[in-house]
Amino acid sequence: MKTIITIGCQYGSAGHSIGKILADDLGIKYYDKELLERAAKDSGLCQELFENHDEKPTNSFLYSLVMDSYSFGYGSTMMDMPLNQKVFLAQFDAIKKISQDGPCVIVGRCADYALEENPNVLSIFIKADMQDRIRRIAKLYDLSDAKAKDKITKIDKQRASYYNYYTSKRWGEVDSYDLCLNSSVFGIDGTVDMIKQAIEVKEAGIRKIFSI
């Protein structure tokens, strides 16, 4: 197996659970918060910095600074960079290094964009009906339905802002991913099965390409 699965998701859609079950079933590594640990270790920066900046929205001016620095190489100027730049670039590099270790599941953090030129990547987006999301978050955090909905709206907005600034795509839009699935329709296990089927089709295509 060569496929690297990246998963973006609406808050409360069970995307993280789906990713973890998928990785366990396939016997491959799973990266969610684990990615922050890897980025901190590789960069020498404190892990708390990554947690504090994790998928937080930024502004377009900072984005341009970050991408200019990445384009021209940042090894010699890393110490001169604003903290946000250091965190973003370290995380970006960690994703690329992780992809070199073999097949895995990476949740969030613009991983699909970081690896968009990798032919082995299958990018997934998980959504769910709002009522199911409210029910899940309300139960998980012992919140009223109203507070759960507010939390969902806030975090979705943060994820969209982060993704839209750091990529050339739009968060949650079908054109941004290889496959979009509704976990309310398929359920958690059914969504995992759908992704497995997609991986099988992609793997067959990869084998065909290399056999020509």
Model regions: which residues?
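Pre-Walker A (Motif I) flank of P-loop NTPase domains
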Residues: 1-10, 102
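Conserved phosphate-donor/acceptor-positioning beta-strand/loop module used by diverse small-molecule
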Residues: 117-139, 145-153
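RNA pseudouridine synthases
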Residues: 98, 111-117
